[in-house]
Amino acid sequence: MKSLTSGVLALGMVLAVTPAFAQAAGEKGPERIVWAAHKTPDSPYTKPNRPIWHIADILKAHQGKQSWDQQILLTRDYDGHYVSMAPGEKTKCMFYADDRVFGWIYSGQVKITIDGQQPFTANKGYLFDVAPRLSYCLENTGTEPVVFYRSTPAGQVPSYPESETPTPIKGWVYGKAKITSTGGYEEPNQPFLDFNAYATGGGKSRDFAFDGHTAAHIIRSGNVKALPPSTSWGHFHENMVEAWVVIEGQLDVLITGEPLVTGELGDVIQANNERWHRATCHPNIGSCTRLAMTPRNKEGQVHYFQTGQPPGN
């Protein structure tokens, strides 16, 4: 009995001097003032990136063509394209090893087939999310071209099921290999969302494509009567680009070093890393929604705000 008491006492002493490693992380901790770095001059926009791509200009550039592919965004994390497929056109089935493919349908309709899921037809306004390691194929089953925005992981080439013939890519060679990993869907991820119906039904802001690398959020905002003052800059991120696809209404974005830009439905707006940015609905047009794209949000993400502005501005 004496030895048991001694053992309990010794254990208590060990626990008393053992550091507490458990510590909850999050974005709603106590407010504190820090020194944060900005590049000087501002982080540049290199091709194909620019503060705003207008869908009207993209469509005009491909006028008379039904099938085309234009890269409009390339960051460390995402490779964003606007794509048009002619009626009857099909893609090969492919997948990405450890990252998602996601996008939004601007016009037309496309049949999307994903491993393990029932094929579905995505019409205008649909969002789609292909989980890693699940092959997917696209087919235009409509009578007009389908135009959509699609994001794939930057710097990564796709893999193909054995039944497909890989498309040659300069600097790469394909060979057969075995894998055992597969993909799947966990909340909040889902293969598709009819955004127009979601919005009509009063749907709120939510995560859509979301994991340890990818973060694509539906951000819905209500009508505003006037823009914030020009002294309100919003926030910025370190070492992280933020971009938006306007999927409802009109969006006004103020970005460091740029004049105020107004995005219409389908436009893509990009704020480079370390640049202040403030996104609001264009005044007096009703609600607006953007598909906001940043990386690494699941583990938390620092938003740097101005010291002289109210919280969140």
Regions found by a protein language model. Give the residues of each.
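A short, N-terminal "cap"/entry segment at the start of jelly-roll beta-barrel domains
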Residues: 23-79, 92-93, 158-221, 226, ...
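Sec/Tat signal peptide C-region and signal peptidase I cleavage site
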Residues: 18-22
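Bacterial N-terminal signal peptides
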Residues: 8-16
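Short, conserved beta-strand element in jelly-roll/cupin
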Residues: 84-85, 95-112, 236-253
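Short histidine-centered beta-strand/loop micro-motifs
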Residues: 70-72, 91-97, 114, 139-140, ...
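Ligand-binding loop in jelly-roll beta-barrel domains
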Residues: 132-158, 273-301
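Bacterial N-terminal signal peptides that target proteins for export
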Residues: 1-8
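Short acidic-glycine-tyrosine-enriched beta hairpin
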Residues: 116-132, 257-274
